[in-house]
Amino acid sequence: MDEFHRYGKEDSSWQQCFLYPLFFQEDLYAISHDHYLDGSSSSEPMEHLSSNDQFSFLTVKRLIGQIRQQNHSIVLFVNCDPNPLVDRKKSSYSESVLEGLTLVLEVPFSIRSKYSVEGMNEWKSFRSIHSIFPFLEDKFPHSNYVSDTRIPYSIHPEILVRTFRRWIGDAPSLHPLRSILYEYRNSSESLQRSIIVVPKVNTRFFLFLWNNYVYECESILVSLLKRSSHSRSLSHGSFPQRTHFHRKIKNIFLFSRRNSFQSIWSLKDPNIHYVRYGERSIIAIKGTNLLVKKYRYYLPIFRQCYFHLWNEPYRVCSHQLSKNCSSSLGYFLRFRMKPLLVKTKMLDELFIADLITDEFDPIVPIVPIIGLLSREKFCDISGRPISKLSWTSLTDDDILDRFDRIWRNLFHYYSGSFGRDGLYRIKYILSLSCAKTLACKHKSTIRVVRKELGPELFKKSFSKERELDSPPFSSKAAARSQRERIWHSDIPQINPLAHSWQKIQDLKIENLFDQ
Protein backbone atom coordinates (compact mmCIF):
# COMPACT_ATOMS: atom_id res chain seq x y z
CA MET A 1 0.00 0.00 0.00
CA ASP A 2 2.83 2.38 0.78
CA GLU A 3 4.38 1.62 -2.61
CA PHE A 4 1.04 2.32 -4.27
CA HIS A 5 0.87 5.68 -2.48
CA ARG A 6 4.40 6.53 -3.57
CA TYR A 7 3.75 5.73 -7.22
CA GLY A 8 0.47 7.61 -7.08
CA LYS A 9 2.28 10.72 -5.87
CA GLU A 10 4.71 10.56 -8.77
CA ASP A 11 2.02 10.06 -11.38
CA SER A 12 -1.49 10.96 -10.30
CA SER A 13 -3.07 9.66 -13.51
CA TRP A 14 -2.17 5.99 -13.08
CA GLN A 15 -3.89 5.78 -9.70
CA GLN A 16 -7.22 5.67 -11.56
CA CYS A 17 -6.19 2.55 -13.50
CA PHE A 18 -5.20 -1.00 -12.69
CA LEU A 19 -7.14 -1.20 -9.44
CA TYR A 20 -8.72 -4.54 -10.28
CA PRO A 21 -5.46 -6.58 -9.98
CA LEU A 22 -5.21 -5.38 -6.38
CA PHE A 23 -8.21 -7.53 -5.49
CA PHE A 24 -6.02 -10.62 -6.02
CA GLN A 25 -3.16 -9.54 -3.77
CA GLU A 26 -2.85 -12.05 -0.95
CA ASP A 27 -1.43 -9.51 1.50
CA LEU A 28 -4.51 -7.35 1.06
CA TYR A 29 -6.87 -10.06 2.32
CA ALA A 30 -4.53 -11.02 5.11
CA ILE A 31 -4.83 -7.43 6.36
CA SER A 32 -8.60 -7.36 5.87
CA HIS A 33 -9.00 -10.71 7.65
CA ASP A 34 -7.02 -9.37 10.61
CA HIS A 35 -9.26 -6.29 10.68
CA TYR A 36 -12.33 -8.52 10.72
CA LEU A 37 -10.96 -10.59 13.61
CA ASP A 38 -10.02 -7.45 15.55
CA GLY A 39 -13.50 -6.02 15.07
CA SER A 40 -15.32 -9.19 16.01
CA SER A 41 -13.11 -10.22 18.93
CA SER A 42 -14.84 -7.79 21.27
CA SER A 43 -18.30 -9.25 20.62
CA GLU A 44 -17.59 -12.93 19.92
CA PRO A 45 -16.28 -15.58 22.31
CA MET A 46 -12.67 -16.53 21.86
CA GLU A 47 -13.46 -20.21 21.38
CA HIS A 48 -15.17 -19.39 18.10
CA LEU A 49 -12.04 -17.60 16.87
CA SER A 50 -9.71 -20.54 17.27
CA SER A 51 -6.97 -21.50 14.87
CA ASN A 52 -9.10 -24.32 13.46
CA ASP A 53 -10.82 -21.84 11.16
CA GLN A 54 -7.96 -21.42 8.72
CA PHE A 55 -8.30 -18.59 6.24
CA SER A 56 -8.00 -19.85 2.65
CA PHE A 57 -6.95 -17.33 0.02
CA LEU A 58 -8.14 -19.69 -2.74
CA THR A 59 -11.65 -19.47 -1.30
CA VAL A 60 -11.46 -15.69 -1.50
CA LYS A 61 -10.40 -15.89 -5.17
CA ARG A 62 -13.29 -18.24 -5.90
CA LEU A 63 -15.61 -15.85 -4.07
CA ILE A 64 -14.48 -12.91 -6.22
CA GLY A 65 -15.00 -14.98 -9.36
CA GLN A 66 -18.57 -15.76 -8.31
CA ILE A 67 -19.19 -12.07 -7.73
CA ARG A 68 -17.97 -11.27 -11.27
CA GLN A 69 -20.31 -13.87 -12.78
CA GLN A 70 -23.31 -12.27 -11.02
CA ASN A 71 -25.18 -15.56 -10.96
CA HIS A 72 -26.37 -15.07 -7.36
CA SER A 73 -24.59 -18.24 -6.28
CA ILE A 74 -22.94 -16.34 -3.42
CA VAL A 75 -24.83 -14.34 -0.84
CA LEU A 76 -22.68 -11.87 1.06
CA PHE A 77 -25.17 -10.15 3.32
CA VAL A 78 -27.86 -12.68 4.14
CA ASN A 79 -25.36 -15.15 5.56
CA CYS A 80 -23.59 -12.52 7.65
CA ASP A 81 -25.50 -13.65 10.71
CA PRO A 82 -24.38 -12.09 14.01
CA ASN A 83 -24.65 -15.52 15.63
CA PRO A 84 -21.13 -17.00 15.45
CA LEU A 85 -22.54 -20.54 15.42
CA VAL A 86 -24.44 -20.03 12.15
CA ASP A 87 -22.20 -20.38 9.10
CA ARG A 88 -19.48 -18.26 10.64
CA LYS A 89 -16.76 -19.29 8.17
CA LYS A 90 -18.79 -18.08 5.21
CA SER A 91 -19.47 -14.84 7.06
CA SER A 92 -15.74 -14.31 7.65
CA TYR A 93 -15.00 -14.70 3.94
CA SER A 94 -17.77 -12.26 3.05
CA GLU A 95 -16.50 -9.71 5.54
CA SER A 96 -12.96 -10.17 4.23
CA VAL A 97 -14.10 -9.43 0.68
CA LEU A 98 -15.87 -6.28 1.88
CA GLU A 99 -12.78 -5.21 3.83
CA GLY A 100 -10.54 -5.87 0.82
CA LEU A 101 -12.82 -3.94 -1.51
CA THR A 102 -12.87 -1.02 0.90
CA LEU A 103 -9.09 -1.00 1.27
CA VAL A 104 -8.61 -0.88 -2.51
CA LEU A 105 -11.10 1.96 -2.98
CA GLU A 106 -9.71 3.93 -0.04
CA VAL A 107 -6.27 4.26 -1.63
CA PRO A 108 -7.17 6.49 -4.62
CA PHE A 109 -9.76 8.28 -2.51
CA SER A 110 -7.19 9.21 0.14
CA ILE A 111 -4.67 10.28 -2.52
CA ARG A 112 -7.32 12.45 -4.12
CA SER A 113 -8.08 14.02 -0.76
CA LYS A 114 -4.38 14.54 -0.07
CA TYR A 115 -3.97 16.55 -3.26
CA SER A 116 -6.93 18.76 -2.34
CA VAL A 117 -5.29 19.83 0.94
CA GLU A 118 -1.70 19.99 -0.31
CA GLY A 119 -0.09 23.39 0.16
CA MET A 120 -2.43 24.56 2.89
CA ASN A 121 -0.34 25.56 5.85
CA GLU A 122 -3.23 26.18 8.22
CA TRP A 123 -5.20 23.05 7.41
CA LYS A 124 -6.47 21.22 10.46
CA SER A 125 -8.59 18.12 10.78
CA PHE A 126 -11.56 18.17 13.15
CA ARG A 127 -14.31 15.76 13.82
CA SER A 128 -17.62 17.05 12.55
CA ILE A 129 -18.99 17.66 16.05
CA HIS A 130 -16.22 20.21 16.65
CA SER A 131 -17.22 22.28 13.62
CA ILE A 132 -20.55 23.10 15.27
CA PHE A 133 -19.21 25.30 18.05
CA PRO A 134 -17.17 27.71 15.84
CA PHE A 135 -20.32 28.03 13.74
CA LEU A 136 -22.39 28.93 16.81
CA GLU A 137 -19.74 31.46 17.87
CA ASP A 138 -19.52 33.02 14.40
CA LYS A 139 -21.00 36.45 13.70
CA PHE A 140 -23.70 36.83 11.06
CA PRO A 141 -23.63 40.46 9.97
CA HIS A 142 -24.82 39.66 6.43
CA SER A 143 -27.31 36.86 7.06
CA ASN A 144 -31.00 37.03 7.79
CA TYR A 145 -32.26 33.54 6.93
CA VAL A 146 -31.18 30.08 8.01
CA SER A 147 -31.90 26.85 6.15
CA ASP A 148 -31.84 23.52 7.97
CA THR A 149 -31.39 20.62 5.53
CA ARG A 150 -31.21 16.89 6.07
CA ILE A 151 -29.04 15.07 3.56
CA PRO A 152 -31.00 12.23 1.90
CA TYR A 153 -29.50 8.88 2.76
CA SER A 154 -31.66 6.59 0.59
CA ILE A 155 -29.96 6.31 -2.78
CA HIS A 156 -29.94 3.92 -5.72
CA PRO A 157 -26.89 1.61 -5.91
CA GLU A 158 -26.13 2.66 -9.48
CA ILE A 159 -25.81 6.30 -8.41
CA LEU A 160 -23.17 5.32 -5.86
CA VAL A 161 -21.27 3.42 -8.54
CA ARG A 162 -21.41 6.44 -10.85
CA THR A 163 -19.96 8.69 -8.17
CA PHE A 164 -16.95 6.36 -8.00
CA ARG A 165 -16.81 6.15 -11.80
CA ARG A 166 -16.23 9.90 -12.05
CA TRP A 167 -12.77 9.65 -10.54
CA ILE A 168 -11.82 5.99 -11.04
CA GLY A 169 -10.95 5.05 -14.61
CA ASP A 170 -10.67 1.30 -13.99
CA ALA A 171 -14.20 0.09 -14.79
CA PRO A 172 -13.60 -3.62 -13.90
CA SER A 173 -12.71 -2.63 -10.34
CA LEU A 174 -16.24 -1.28 -9.88
CA HIS A 175 -17.99 -4.51 -10.93
CA PRO A 176 -17.55 -6.12 -7.48
CA LEU A 177 -18.82 -2.91 -5.86
CA ARG A 178 -21.90 -2.88 -8.11
CA SER A 179 -22.64 -6.55 -7.42
CA ILE A 180 -22.27 -6.13 -3.66
CA LEU A 181 -24.51 -3.05 -3.57
CA TYR A 182 -27.24 -4.71 -5.61
CA GLU A 183 -27.04 -7.86 -3.54
CA TYR A 184 -27.31 -5.85 -0.34
CA ARG A 185 -30.38 -4.09 -1.73
CA ASN A 186 -32.01 -7.38 -2.75
CA SER A 187 -31.23 -9.01 0.58
CA SER A 188 -32.78 -6.21 2.64
CA GLU A 189 -36.24 -6.65 4.10
CA SER A 190 -37.70 -3.63 2.32
CA LEU A 191 -38.67 -3.86 -1.35
CA GLN A 192 -37.38 -0.39 -2.22
CA ARG A 193 -35.06 0.16 -5.14
CA SER A 194 -32.67 2.25 -3.07
CA ILE A 195 -30.31 1.38 -0.23
CA ILE A 196 -29.54 3.14 3.02
CA VAL A 197 -26.00 4.54 3.08
CA VAL A 198 -26.12 5.83 6.67
CA PRO A 199 -23.62 3.64 8.58
CA LYS A 200 -26.08 2.06 11.01
CA VAL A 201 -23.74 -0.92 11.07
CA ASN A 202 -20.37 0.50 12.05
CA THR A 203 -18.34 -1.27 9.40
CA ARG A 204 -15.50 0.10 7.32
CA PHE A 205 -17.40 -0.50 4.09
CA PHE A 206 -20.52 1.49 5.02
CA LEU A 207 -18.48 4.26 6.64
CA PHE A 208 -16.56 4.61 3.40
CA LEU A 209 -19.77 4.72 1.33
CA TRP A 210 -21.26 7.39 3.58
CA ASN A 211 -18.13 9.58 3.62
CA ASN A 212 -17.76 9.39 -0.16
CA TYR A 213 -21.44 10.22 -0.66
CA VAL A 214 -21.24 13.24 1.67
CA TYR A 215 -18.02 14.31 -0.07
CA GLU A 216 -19.87 14.44 -3.39
CA CYS A 217 -22.82 16.32 -1.89
CA GLU A 218 -20.64 18.99 -0.33
CA SER A 219 -18.38 19.33 -3.37
CA ILE A 220 -21.45 20.38 -5.36
CA LEU A 221 -22.48 22.81 -2.66
CA VAL A 222 -19.04 24.43 -2.52
CA SER A 223 -19.03 25.27 -6.23
CA LEU A 224 -22.46 26.87 -5.89
CA LEU A 225 -21.40 28.90 -2.87
CA LYS A 226 -18.36 30.20 -4.71
CA ARG A 227 -20.48 31.42 -7.60
CA SER A 228 -23.21 32.95 -5.45
CA SER A 229 -21.16 34.75 -2.82
CA HIS A 230 -17.87 35.21 -4.74
CA SER A 231 -16.06 34.07 -1.65
CA ARG A 232 -12.79 32.24 -1.43
CA SER A 233 -13.18 28.89 0.24
CA LEU A 234 -10.76 26.14 1.01
CA SER A 235 -12.05 22.69 0.20
CA HIS A 236 -10.73 20.15 2.66
CA GLY A 237 -10.60 16.54 1.63
CA SER A 238 -12.36 13.76 3.44
CA PHE A 239 -10.33 10.76 4.48
CA PRO A 240 -12.26 7.56 5.17
CA GLN A 241 -12.20 8.16 8.92
CA ARG A 242 -12.65 11.92 8.78
CA THR A 243 -15.34 14.33 7.78
CA HIS A 244 -15.34 16.72 4.87
CA PHE A 245 -15.79 20.33 5.88
CA HIS A 246 -15.02 23.81 4.60
CA ARG A 247 -13.32 26.78 6.21
CA LYS A 248 -13.73 30.30 4.95
CA ILE A 249 -10.91 32.81 4.60
CA LYS A 250 -11.82 36.38 5.50
CA ASN A 251 -9.79 39.19 4.05
CA ILE A 252 -10.19 42.85 3.21
CA PHE A 253 -9.97 44.19 -0.32
CA LEU A 254 -10.10 47.69 -1.80
CA PHE A 255 -12.21 48.86 -4.72
CA SER A 256 -13.14 52.30 -6.03
CA ARG A 257 -16.35 53.77 -7.37
CA ARG A 258 -16.65 55.04 -10.90
CA ASN A 259 -16.38 58.80 -11.35
CA SER A 260 -15.37 59.19 -7.75
CA PHE A 261 -12.11 59.62 -5.94
CA GLN A 262 -13.39 57.99 -2.80
CA SER A 263 -12.16 54.54 -1.94
CA ILE A 264 -14.34 52.18 0.01
CA TRP A 265 -13.01 49.50 2.30
CA SER A 266 -15.22 46.46 2.22
CA LEU A 267 -15.04 43.29 4.19
CA LYS A 268 -14.88 40.31 1.87
CA ASP A 269 -16.97 38.15 4.17
CA PRO A 270 -18.98 35.41 2.50
CA ASN A 271 -22.73 35.85 2.72
CA ILE A 272 -23.25 32.14 3.26
CA HIS A 273 -22.25 30.25 6.41
CA TYR A 274 -22.28 26.47 6.35
CA VAL A 275 -21.89 23.68 8.89
CA ARG A 276 -22.74 19.97 8.90
CA TYR A 277 -22.99 17.24 11.49
CA GLY A 278 -24.08 13.77 10.41
CA GLU A 279 -26.97 14.11 7.99
CA ARG A 280 -27.93 17.63 9.08
CA SER A 281 -26.50 20.76 7.48
CA ILE A 282 -27.24 24.40 8.29
CA ILE A 283 -26.81 27.26 5.81
CA ALA A 284 -27.18 30.88 6.91
CA ILE A 285 -27.72 33.17 3.91
CA LYS A 286 -28.48 36.83 3.23
CA GLY A 287 -31.34 37.93 1.03
CA THR A 288 -34.99 38.70 0.69
CA ASN A 289 -37.77 36.21 1.21
CA LEU A 290 -37.99 35.65 -2.55
CA LEU A 291 -34.25 34.96 -2.81
CA VAL A 292 -34.41 32.46 0.05
CA LYS A 293 -37.30 30.66 -1.64
CA LYS A 294 -35.23 30.44 -4.81
CA TYR A 295 -32.32 28.97 -2.88
CA ARG A 296 -34.63 26.52 -1.16
CA TYR A 297 -35.99 25.44 -4.54
CA TYR A 298 -32.76 25.52 -6.54
CA LEU A 299 -30.43 23.59 -4.23
CA PRO A 300 -32.65 20.49 -3.85
CA ILE A 301 -33.45 20.49 -7.58
CA PHE A 302 -29.77 20.69 -8.44
CA ARG A 303 -28.98 17.81 -6.06
CA GLN A 304 -31.87 15.79 -7.50
CA CYS A 305 -30.58 16.25 -11.04
CA TYR A 306 -27.03 15.39 -10.00
CA PHE A 307 -27.85 12.28 -7.98
CA HIS A 308 -31.14 11.34 -9.72
CA LEU A 309 -33.04 11.11 -6.44
CA TRP A 310 -36.05 12.85 -4.96
CA ASN A 311 -35.85 15.04 -1.86
CA GLU A 312 -38.84 15.16 0.44
CA PRO A 313 -40.04 18.74 1.08
CA TYR A 314 -39.91 18.35 4.86
CA ARG A 315 -36.14 17.76 4.72
CA VAL A 316 -35.51 21.45 3.91
CA CYS A 317 -36.75 24.06 6.42
CA SER A 318 -36.06 27.80 6.18
CA HIS A 319 -36.51 30.31 9.00
CA GLN A 320 -36.15 34.06 9.27
CA LEU A 321 -33.54 34.75 11.90
CA SER A 322 -35.17 37.74 13.55
CA LYS A 323 -38.65 36.21 13.91
CA ASN A 324 -38.47 32.45 14.29
CA CYS A 325 -36.72 30.07 16.64
CA SER A 326 -35.54 26.88 14.96
CA SER A 327 -34.56 23.58 16.54
CA SER A 328 -31.42 21.88 15.32
CA LEU A 329 -28.46 19.93 16.68
CA GLY A 330 -30.26 19.46 19.99
CA TYR A 331 -30.66 23.21 20.64
CA PHE A 332 -33.34 25.83 20.32
CA LEU A 333 -31.56 28.27 17.99
CA ARG A 334 -32.52 31.92 17.89
CA PHE A 335 -30.72 35.07 16.87
CA ARG A 336 -30.16 38.09 19.00
CA MET A 337 -28.73 41.47 18.10
CA LYS A 338 -25.53 42.42 19.87
CA PRO A 339 -24.91 46.19 19.86
CA LEU A 340 -21.37 47.49 20.03
CA LEU A 341 -20.50 51.14 20.67
CA VAL A 342 -17.29 52.26 18.94
CA LYS A 343 -15.68 55.63 19.73
CA THR A 344 -13.02 57.00 17.41
CA LYS A 345 -11.14 60.21 18.21
CA MET A 346 -9.33 62.06 15.44
CA LEU A 347 -7.66 65.28 16.57
CA ASP A 348 -10.42 67.33 18.20
CA GLU A 349 -13.37 65.45 16.77
CA LEU A 350 -14.99 62.41 18.33
CA PHE A 351 -16.91 59.98 16.16
CA ILE A 352 -19.34 57.51 17.70
CA ALA A 353 -20.60 54.56 15.70
CA ASP A 354 -23.09 51.87 16.66
CA LEU A 355 -22.33 48.45 15.24
CA ILE A 356 -25.02 45.80 15.45
CA THR A 357 -24.20 42.19 14.71
CA ASP A 358 -26.30 39.06 14.90
CA GLU A 359 -25.16 35.96 16.71
CA PHE A 360 -26.62 32.59 17.57
CA ASP A 361 -28.23 32.23 20.96
CA PRO A 362 -28.49 28.48 21.60
CA ILE A 363 -31.05 27.64 24.27
CA VAL A 364 -31.21 24.46 26.31
CA PRO A 365 -34.50 22.61 25.60
CA ILE A 366 -35.31 21.91 29.25
CA VAL A 367 -38.93 20.79 28.81
CA PRO A 368 -38.15 18.29 25.99
CA ILE A 369 -35.22 16.88 27.99
CA ILE A 370 -37.47 16.37 31.01
CA GLY A 371 -39.96 14.62 28.74
CA LEU A 372 -37.23 12.28 27.50
CA LEU A 373 -36.09 11.62 31.07
CA SER A 374 -39.66 10.67 31.96
CA ARG A 375 -39.74 8.31 29.00
CA GLU A 376 -36.55 6.66 30.27
CA LYS A 377 -38.13 6.32 33.75
CA PHE A 378 -35.88 8.81 35.56
CA CYS A 379 -38.86 10.99 36.52
CA ASP A 380 -42.57 11.33 35.90
CA ILE A 381 -44.23 13.66 33.40
CA SER A 382 -44.18 16.59 35.84
CA GLY A 383 -40.42 16.18 36.44
CA ARG A 384 -40.63 14.49 39.84
CA PRO A 385 -37.63 12.13 40.26
CA ILE A 386 -38.29 8.40 40.58
CA SER A 387 -36.02 5.40 40.99
CA LYS A 388 -34.59 3.61 37.96
CA LEU A 389 -35.84 0.10 38.77
CA SER A 390 -34.09 -1.57 35.84
CA TRP A 391 -30.69 -0.56 37.29
CA THR A 392 -31.21 -1.95 40.79
CA SER A 393 -29.50 -5.21 39.82
CA LEU A 394 -26.25 -3.36 39.07
CA THR A 395 -23.49 -2.57 41.51
CA ASP A 396 -23.31 0.79 43.27
CA ASP A 397 -20.33 1.86 41.17
CA ASP A 398 -22.11 1.00 37.93
CA ILE A 399 -25.17 2.97 38.98
CA LEU A 400 -23.07 6.02 39.87
CA ASP A 401 -21.09 5.71 36.63
CA ARG A 402 -24.22 5.64 34.51
CA PHE A 403 -25.76 8.68 36.17
CA ASP A 404 -22.40 10.42 35.97
CA ARG A 405 -22.15 9.73 32.25
CA ILE A 406 -25.61 11.12 31.55
CA TRP A 407 -25.02 14.34 33.49
CA ARG A 408 -21.51 14.85 32.13
CA ASN A 409 -22.71 14.54 28.53
CA LEU A 410 -25.60 16.91 29.13
CA PHE A 411 -23.55 19.51 30.98
CA HIS A 412 -20.66 19.50 28.51
CA TYR A 413 -22.87 19.66 25.44
CA TYR A 414 -24.97 22.56 26.74
CA SER A 415 -22.21 24.34 28.66
CA GLY A 416 -21.87 27.03 26.00
CA SER A 417 -25.56 27.91 25.95
CA PHE A 418 -26.97 31.05 27.48
CA GLY A 419 -29.27 30.64 30.45
CA ARG A 420 -27.87 27.43 31.86
CA ASP A 421 -29.97 27.72 35.02
CA GLY A 422 -32.37 25.13 33.67
CA LEU A 423 -29.58 22.55 33.70
CA TYR A 424 -29.59 22.60 37.49
CA ARG A 425 -33.16 21.31 37.40
CA ILE A 426 -31.91 18.40 35.30
CA LYS A 427 -29.11 17.92 37.83
CA TYR A 428 -31.64 17.79 40.67
CA ILE A 429 -33.72 15.17 38.84
CA LEU A 430 -30.71 12.96 38.09
CA SER A 431 -29.14 13.25 41.54
CA LEU A 432 -32.37 12.47 43.38
CA SER A 433 -33.17 9.64 40.96
CA CYS A 434 -29.71 8.21 41.63
CA ALA A 435 -30.29 8.37 45.39
CA LYS A 436 -33.72 6.74 45.05
CA THR A 437 -32.27 3.98 42.88
CA LEU A 438 -29.63 3.17 45.50
CA ALA A 439 -32.22 3.32 48.27
CA CYS A 440 -34.51 0.95 46.36
CA LYS A 441 -31.63 -1.45 45.77
CA HIS A 442 -30.63 -1.57 49.45
CA LYS A 443 -34.28 -1.45 50.62
CA SER A 444 -33.75 1.68 52.66
CA THR A 445 -34.57 5.38 52.45
CA ILE A 446 -32.84 8.29 50.77
CA ARG A 447 -31.85 9.68 54.17
CA VAL A 448 -30.11 6.43 55.11
CA VAL A 449 -28.27 6.31 51.77
CA ARG A 450 -27.05 9.88 52.16
CA LYS A 451 -26.01 9.21 55.75
CA GLU A 452 -24.08 6.04 54.92
CA LEU A 453 -22.32 7.26 51.80
CA GLY A 454 -22.12 10.93 52.73
CA PRO A 455 -19.94 12.94 50.33
CA GLU A 456 -18.92 9.73 48.57
CA LEU A 457 -22.40 9.47 47.05
CA PHE A 458 -21.72 11.99 44.32
CA LYS A 459 -17.95 12.05 44.42
CA LYS A 460 -17.74 10.98 40.80
CA SER A 461 -21.16 12.11 39.66
CA PHE A 462 -21.61 15.85 39.17
CA SER A 463 -18.03 16.69 40.17
CA LYS A 464 -16.98 18.10 36.79
CA GLU A 465 -19.63 20.77 37.04
CA ARG A 466 -18.22 22.03 40.35
CA GLU A 467 -14.78 22.50 38.83
CA LEU A 468 -16.12 24.39 35.83
CA ASP A 469 -18.58 26.57 37.73
CA SER A 470 -16.36 27.42 40.68
CA PRO A 471 -17.14 30.88 42.11
CA PRO A 472 -14.81 33.58 40.76
CA PHE A 473 -12.83 35.91 42.96
CA SER A 474 -14.43 39.18 41.89
CA SER A 475 -17.82 40.42 40.75
CA LYS A 476 -16.27 41.60 37.47
CA ALA A 477 -15.06 38.10 36.75
CA ALA A 478 -18.49 36.76 37.64
CA ALA A 479 -20.17 39.11 35.17
CA ARG A 480 -17.64 38.12 32.54
CA SER A 481 -18.32 34.42 33.09
CA GLN A 482 -22.03 35.06 32.50
CA ARG A 483 -21.32 36.74 29.16
CA GLU A 484 -18.78 34.25 27.83
CA ARG A 485 -19.53 30.78 26.57
CA ILE A 486 -17.24 27.81 27.10
CA TRP A 487 -17.46 24.86 24.72
CA HIS A 488 -15.83 21.59 25.73
CA SER A 489 -13.79 19.87 23.03
CA ASP A 490 -14.10 16.40 24.55
CA ILE A 491 -17.61 15.86 23.20
CA PRO A 492 -17.49 12.84 20.86
CA GLN A 493 -21.05 13.12 19.55
CA ILE A 494 -24.40 14.79 20.02
CA ASN A 495 -25.93 13.93 23.37
CA PRO A 496 -28.27 10.90 23.01
CA LEU A 497 -31.13 12.75 24.72
CA ALA A 498 -30.67 15.72 22.39
CA HIS A 499 -30.50 13.36 19.42
CA SER A 500 -33.76 11.67 20.47
CA TRP A 501 -35.45 15.03 20.93
CA GLN A 502 -34.31 16.10 17.46
CA LYS A 503 -35.87 12.97 15.98
CA ILE A 504 -39.17 13.86 17.64
CA GLN A 505 -39.01 17.36 16.16
CA ASP A 506 -38.31 15.90 12.71
CA LEU A 507 -41.32 13.59 13.00
CA LYS A 508 -43.54 16.56 13.86
CA ILE A 509 -42.38 18.35 10.71
CA GLU A 510 -42.99 15.24 8.60
CA ASN A 511 -46.52 14.90 9.99
CA LEU A 512 -47.28 18.51 9.05
CA PHE A 513 -46.34 17.80 5.43
CA ASP A 514 -48.33 14.56 5.38
CA GLN A 515 -51.55 16.29 6.42
Curated annotation (Swiss-Prot):
The organism's lineage is:
Eukaryota, Viridiplantae, Streptophyta, Embryophyta, Tracheophyta
Swiss-Prot/TrEMBL keywords: Chloroplast, mRNA processing, Plastid, RNA-binding, tRNA processing
Name the UniProt record assigns to this protein = Maturase K
UniProt main location, coarse: plastid
Task: Please verify whether the record's keywords include tRNA processing.
Answer: yes
Any Pfam family hit: Intron_maturas2
Name one molecular function that GO assigns to this entry: RNA binding
One GO BP annotation is: mRNA processing
Organism source for this protein?
Answer: Picea glauca
Q: What does this protein do?
A: Usually encoded in the trnK tRNA gene intron. Probably assists in splicing its own and other chloroplast group II introns.
The signal peptide annotation in the UniProt record is none
Compartment annotation: Plastid, Chloroplast
Family to which the UniProt record says this protein belongs: Belongs to the intron maturase 2 family. MatK subfamily.
InterPro entries reported for this sequence:
Domain_X, Maturase_MatK, Maturase_MatK_N
**Gene Ontology CC terms:** chloroplast
Plastid as a keyword of this entry, yes or no, is yes
